Curated annotation (Swiss-Prot):
Protein name (database record): Pyridoxal phosphate homeostasis protein
CDD domains: PLPDE_III_Yggs_like (cd06824)
Pfam families per UniProt: Ala_racemase_N
Taxon lineage: Bacteria, Pseudomonadati, Pseudomonadota, Gammaproteobacteria, Vibrionales
Protein family membership: Belongs to the pyridoxal phosphate-binding protein YggS/PROSC family.
Keywords: Pyridoxal phosphate
Cellular component terms per the entry's GO annotation: cytoplasm
Length: 236
């Protein structure tokens, strides 16, 4: 059984290999360690392997961790990404603590995040979540509504629109994975023609990371392959 540090080294090597295979520059893909349900001790172990970017799905759990590391390990300067579904009654906590939000899919959430972002903090870096698979069970805006939401976000003073995020249909077939990710990449390229600051594609997890990187992902979200199986009773 590998340690968290060994897992990070293994995944980093996989990312570098995938980048090389498709002719992408080294370090063009960021590893986001998904630490939901994991204790601060596990996150601390990951930082000892050089990991600085962490993703959280649950607002209060994530805020508790951010506060802990700000108080006890401020020298680590960790970057925190909110990657879960976001309800309007939880936006203030996210706006006040996180560095990134990957899951904006409606105007109300964007407006509240900008309004509630403290003036002494830099703009919140945000991604629009797009439902490319059309699955009713998945969050995300429909592709045809994307450009209207992007226009709104671009005018909000305390948000910086950086790109797109998706969770495509879970399929084992590599060509199907690649096609789904390519669809999101093409939408991002269209947006970037109008908004030059757009440079981020958050897509790819353990089972489809290779296809995501080939399609242009800049952030892959990896959880159990780093930290092991999750204990959801912590959030019951």
């Amino acid at each position: 059984m590998r340690s968290i540090q060994q897992n990070i080294e293994h995944i980093t090597a996989q990312i570098e290999s995938a980048q090389q295979k498709c002719g992408r520059a080294r370090s063009s893909v960021q590893l986001l360690a998904v630490s939901k349900t994991k204790p601060v001790e596990a996150i601390l172990e990951a930082t000892q392997a050089g990991q600085r970017y962490f993703g959280e799905n649950y607002v209060q759990e994530g805020v508790d961790k951010i506060r802990y590391f700000a108080e006890h390990h401020p020298q680590l300067a960790l970057e925190w990404h909110f990657i879960g579904p976001l309800q309007s009654n939880k936006t203030r906590l996210v706006a006040e603590h996180f560095d990134w939000v990957h899951t904006i899919d409606r105007e109300k959430i964007a407006l509240r995040l900008s309004e509630q972002r403290p003036v002494n903090m830099p703009p919140l870096q945000v991604l629009i979540q797009v439902n490319t698979s059309g699955e009713a069970s998945k969050s995300g805006i429909e592709p045809q509504q994307l450009f209207t939401l992007a226009e709104l976000i671009s005018r909000l003073p305390n948000l910086t629109l950086r790109g797109l995020m998706s969770i495509p249909e879970n399929v084992p077939d590599y060509p199907a994975q690649l096609a789904a990710f390519t669809q999101l990449a093409e939408l991002q390229q269209q947006l970037a023609q109008k908004y030059p600051q757009i440079d981020t594609l958050s897509m790819g997890m353990s089972g489809d990371m290779q296809a995501a990187i080939e399609a242009g992902s800049t952030i892959v979200r990896i959880g159990t392959a780093i930290f092991g199986e999750r204990d959801y009773s912590r959030n019951a």
